[in-house]
Each structure stands twice: as C-alpha cells, then as structure tokens.
Amino acid sequence: MSALQENGQELPYAGGILKLRIPFVHYRIEYQDFIQGAILSCVPLGITAAMVKVLGIPIEVAVLMVVINNFLYLLHTSFGDPSVSGWITAGIPLYISYLTGFAPGPERIKALIALQVLVGGIFLVLGVTGITRWVIRHFPISMRSGILLGAGFASLMRVFNPAQPFMGKMPIAFIIASLGSFFILFSAKALRFRAQSSLFAWVAGFGIAPGFVIGYICGLLTGEIAPPTGVFDRFIIATPLGDMVSSFTALGIGMPSASQWVAAISLAIVAYVLAFGDILVLEAMIDDCNKSRPDENVVFEVPRNHVITAFRNIFQGICVPFLPLCGPQWTGGQALVVNRFKHSTPEQEPSYWGGATSIFWGMSLAMIFHPFVQIVLPAKLIGFGLTLLIQGYLCIYLAFAMCKTNVQRGIAGVMGAALVSANYVKLWDSAFWSGPTMALIAGAVLFFLLEYDGSKEEETVQ
C-alpha cells in the first residue's frame, strides 16, 4: 500500500480536482479505526432525544436522520478533505432556543430548514471566494492557541463537572476506562512497549477500544452500567424514509417563509463563528500529523472543506433537516484518528486516509444493525467521555506547543478562559454575543494591544 506514494508526497487520487479516493484502491480499510468507529456509533444517537423533543420527530425518523448524516461524513475523506467531520456542537443550546420560538410542527421544521441552508450558504460563499483561507493564513498564533485552549478546557470541564454523568454516575467504570485509554494512547512507556512487543502494538492500535471494553465490563460488575436490553428485537433499524420526506423535509412541507429566512440570518452567522474554531483545530492537528509522519503529506485545503460542508448543510437542510447542523470537524474523532496515525509506522498504517475514512465506515455501518447498537448503547457515556478527554488533552498540548513567547501564552490563556466562561451565554439579549464571539474579540484586542508590532511582519502559521 505504501508503494502507492513516494516518501513525503500526497497519496494518489482519481477524479482530478475532486481528489476522489476509493477504498481498497487508494487506501486500505483500517480495521482498528473501523472498530473504534463501531464502538462510538452510540454517541451520535444521543442527539435523537433532543430531535424528538424539540422537533416533534418520531424516534425512528430521528435515528434515520442520524444515520444519513453519518454516511454523508464520508464525503470529506472521499473527496480529498482530511476532516473527520461532525456537528457544530457548541451552538446546540442556541439552536434549540431559536427553534422553540416557532410553533411546533411544520413551522418549527421550516425554521430549522432556513437556518441550516443559510449556514450552508455562508460556508459556500466563504469557501469559493477564499476569504476564510486568507483570514486563517493571517490569524495570529496567540489567537490560534487561545481557541485550542478554549476547546480543550471546554471538553475537560464537561468531563470533570460533578453535575455531568461521567464522574457522577459511573466513576469506577469511567476512571478505569480513562486510565487504560490514556496509558495506551499517550504514555512514554506504552510507546516503548509498542516497539518491544508486537502483541501490545496490535492491542494499542485499537485506540480507545481496549479501555472502553475494560470500563464497560467494570461498569457491568459494579452496577454502574445496566445490561443491554432489546438486543434481538430486530436486526436492521427501521427506515421510515417516506414518512421523513413527506412530514419533515422541505420536499414534503415546503420551503420557509421570507420572515423565517430573515429570522435565521443572525444565528447562521453565529453558527459559522462557532465552526471557525473547529477549522483552526483541524488545521493544527493535520500539521501535527505531517510533523510526526513525514512519509506522507496530508493536505488540508480550507476551500475544499468549506464547499463539502456547504453541500452537506444545504442538502440536509432541504432533504434531512438536522438539529446540530453540519460542521467542518468532530474534534474528538479527529483526535483518535490523528493519534493512531502519528504513533503507527508506515507498515502498521500506510496512509492517514485509511484511518480517517474507516472510522466513519465503522460508525455508519454499525448504526444500521440494531443488535450491535443496543449492545454498546448502555456504555455510550464512556465512549463520549473518552473522546472529550482525548480531545481536551490534544488541544491543550498543541496550544502550548504553538506559543513561543509569554505574551502569546498570556493572550491564549485569557482567550481560552473567555471562550469557556461565556459559552452559551447571551449577552445583551443576542445569541451573537456567545463565548466564541467574546473570545475572538478579547483575543483580537489583546493581540493588537500587547503583541502586534507594525514595524515588522507578524509571525503567522502558513
């Protein structure tokens, strides 16, 4: 497989400008990432409860929407974008607040359609014009680091908050799963054991899967996790495609009114501001990949990521309205793929693209099989919590490594704190003044006040 590419070059592709890469032709399926994805299949199903409550969608339709959304993630890695994509997660409380201002039923669905299509339009315009690429190219290191720190702190605060279920409801199972996963993924001893033992290297290749399984078993033994039920109620999930199209899409209920389009504009802008941080995190992780594995050049192009994200939002907005919207990256999944690729040899994992694609093949296919989902569903909090921990760890160490001066570190720290402390808070009765907006403003003011020197060209990440 590694013969397909020269040392340090981009993996070959078909399709010209589209950079189409096909499984078993351009890369192999990495069964370790496939299994990690299958285990995490229960995590995206967690949004179905909110979809049922807020949108009035039957649970079978909500599950079908999640499955369709998951398969569309494959558009990124199939067409040359290294993103392990996901939702625009940070804005979910804002979307729910916005939607509850409309009458339940078709009007509320139309409000979501307007919001999601407008978000897609913003991604499309900024991607095609290259505006975002220019902004990122000139984005100060201190502010990049601040966004990474904020993302890391936000993840870890959720895990260690006693009000959250991770430590509150299953402390023994979650702590054991976390310690096992962190040892395998990040320990210096584990890296040495990988080189000394082929068996340990094989087990470590599964990433969080060993820790998840051990934590699951401990949870069953301690009673912190309930045994799975309804495993064999059916084999394949229900697929009420006709009901979904006729009752919950623009194809069945029509397009939003003019007033609904106007009402969604400000929140659509907020959603893009939230997603902008994910783009910076993605770029930092891919850069980390290229430094750790110089045998392959993984290319991240902001316009490509934007255009694919735009297509997902516009298509889903019309045909599969999706409450969390479609974002450019899922940081937790990205961290798992990046970490395994970094610590694998070219023989163990020949190409980044095999792992980045396999995690979603595993997740998407597993969600179709009802028995498998019912087996892993009781431990979904362990899987979700592990991704948050790993996301927080990687974001924080990348943020620290990025800064070169104490001024940059100070700006990054203030910006990260602003992002976390103001998150989900609407100041001046406006959703725009949420945590990410305040963090960007605070970071920009401090950069120009403390760091910027107009007499010389500022250092930026190219």
Name the predicted role of every residue range.
Residues 1-59, 196-200, 204-300, 459-462:
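Helix-loop-helix hairpins and the membrane-proximal interhelical loops
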Residues 14-29, 36-47, 81-151, 295-392:
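Helix-loop-helix junctions within the multi-pass membrane cores of secondary transporters/permeases
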Residues 55-78:
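Loop-to-helix transition at the N-terminal end of transmembrane alpha-helices
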Residues 66-70, 89-90, 444:
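Residue-level recognition of pore/gate-forming positions within transmembrane alpha-helices
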